[in-house]
Structures are given as C-alpha cells and as structure tokens.
Curated annotation (Swiss-Prot):
The gene is leuD. Keywords: Amino-acid biosynthesis, Branched-chain amino acid biosynthesis, Leucine biosynthesis, Lyase. Pfam families: Aconitase_C. Disulfide bonds: none annotated. It comes from Zymomonas mobilis subsp. mobilis (strain ATCC 31821 / ZM4 / CP4). PANTHER family: 3-ISOPROPYLMALATE DEHYDRATASE SMALL SUBUNIT (PTHR43345:SF5), 3-ISOPROPYLMALATE DEHYDRATASE SMALL SUBUNIT 2-RELATED-RELATED (PTHR43345). Its EC number is 4.2.1.33. This is 3-isopropylmalate dehydratase small subunit. One of its GO terms (biological process) is L-leucine biosynthetic process. Pathway: Amino-acid biosynthesis; L-leucine biosynthesis; L-leucine from 3-methyl-2-oxobutanoate: step 2/4. The lineage of its organism: Bacteria, Pseudomonadati, Pseudomonadota, Alphaproteobacteria, Sphingomonadales. It comes from the Bacteria.
C-alpha cells in the first residue's frame, strides 16, 4: 500500500449528499476481483450528465474528492474504494461517511476526512479554482487563502496510512517477534 502523508492538488468538487456505493461503482462492475479497470465505471451515472466534475479537464487526475454528507452509503463493496483509488484519488473529504465505506477505504489506503459541513462548503468553493493541501501527519486541510481545517482520525488508521501499511503489513512488521514467540511456545509446550 502506498503511504499517505501529504495530498496536494486540485479536488473534484462533487458536493452531492447520499452518494451510495452503487453510484460510486455500479453493480455490473462487481464481477471481478481485479482492482484494475474499475475507474472507467466509477461514478458512471454522474458522468452520464453533461458538465459533471469528473469529466471536467480542470479536475483531471485530482488527488482529492470533496463530497456531501453520507458518502459511501448503501451496500458494502470494496470495489467502491478500488475504483476511487484507481481514479488517482488519495483522499475523500465529507461531513460524514458510511461506516462500512470508511472501513473499506482505510483497508485500501484511501484516506477519509470528516469535517463540519461549513468547512466542506468552503472547500467546495475553493476547489472550483484552487488547489487544496491535506496534511495527514498534522491532521489539517489548508487552502491558498490561509484556511485551516483540523480533523480527527483514529491513531491506528493514521499510523497505517502514514506508513503505507494495511493490517496484514502491520502484523508482518513484527514477524521476528512473532517467530520468537512461536519458538518459545514450541519449546515450552512441545505437545502443542
């Protein structure tokens, strides 16, 4: 997993509330366990509308997505996080996320940042014309206009994202300690 420390650049100013996982990646794209190729289906129903933010060349390749309230609601589909990541997005900012989406996003190295609605509205305005900087280590989102929005994040999730580790990778960092423990256990309890 790629480490997430500072995410800087333009942001897709989506701003819509209640974007469910079927809008993020429609069900007919879920027939694969391959993470590649899902970006083409990401936000398909929104992209079908003329003038949508995802097809606007000003935002092409934006590493940040700014959404409205209740982003990622609906069914659990890890493909939603995969599709967003494949678009090049490293962080999503919203007033609230579905718990299951937030968990899937974290497990796939996609940072979710919860900010008050007024702060999200300000970022949506800025994102239309200017870049945004998200600093995970200091837990702050900044704009070129001296706006500073602090956010909370679970310390475990923060550590994993900063180090580019998923739960398995974090466990494997302690492989030597695990092996030592298993050796001691085997010698203390040879019958096991």
């Amino acid at each position: 997993m790629k480490a997430v420390k500072i995410v800087e650049g333009r942001a897709y100013p989506l701003g819509e509330s209640n974007i469910d996982t079927d809008i993020i990646i429609p069900a007919h794209y879920l027939k694969t366990t391959d993470r590649k190729g899902l970006a083409k289906g990401a936000f398909e129903t929104i992209r079908a509308k003329e003038g949508n933010v995802f097809d606007n060349p000003e935002y092409k390749g934006a590493p940040i997505l700014i959404a409205g309230d209740n982003f990622g609601c609906g069914s659990s589909r890890e493909h939603a996080a995969w599709a967003i990541k494949e678009m090049g997005v490293e962080a999503v900012i919203a007033p609230r996320f579905s718990d299951i989406f937030s968990g899937n996003a974290f497990k796939n190295g996609l940072l979710t940042v919860v900010l008050p609605e007024a702060d999200v509205e300000r970022l949506l305005e800025v994102a239309k014309t200017d870049p945004i900087t998200l600093d995970l280590e200091n837990q702050v989102v900044t704009t070129p206009f001296q706006d500073r929005f602090h956010f909370d994040i679970d310390p475990f999730r923060k550590r994993c994202l900063l180090e580019g580790l998923d739960e398995i990778g974090l466990t494997l960092k302690d492989q030597d300690k695990i092996s030592q423990y298993e050796d001691v256990l085997a010698s203390d309890r040879p019958w096991v």
